Amino acid sequence: IIIHEYGHGISNRSNPGGTGCLGNSEQAGEGWSDYLGLMLTQNWATALPGDGFNPPRGIGTYALNQPNNGPGIRPARYCTDFAVNNYTYSNIGAMAVPHGVGFVFCTALWEMTWELINDPSTTGIDPNIYNFAGTGGNVVALRLVMEGLRTQQCNPGFISARNAIMRADTTLYSGSHACAILRAF
């Protein structure tokens, strides 16, 4: 939860429009915050390329006195296994704003991370998530999300936030990860 809340500060202050620029019905603020929580608490030193579905990750488990692998506060745990988390963009119309919509956005970001880890355009997993010069899919994913935040339009929706990630890929990596990004979204 602490990293999640810190993530709100990052997303609100990284957006070019400032702190009042993330308020529409498709805003992904909760998603970026969940994503940062997942990325910064994942043990990348022991993670394997197939771990996107093992184990599924809940958010807020500690606050609910659940074990680390508990369901947490979202409609499903974050996981690339569609049998565990089958939420997609088509579900956002029925999701609560902002937490439900953000959950769906984070689901896509988590899927993108594991697509990049398993894509031949990266070197799999970098055990050091803070190595922004690294070519591991986890590092590439975090860099793309952060650059997308910094360059997206004011009041981005789900699609425009994704498009900002695509532009970040073009800027940072000459678009070499476009297919992996689109598979996730």
Please identify what each model-predicted range represents.
Residues 1-185:
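Extracellular protease catalytic domains of secreted zymogens
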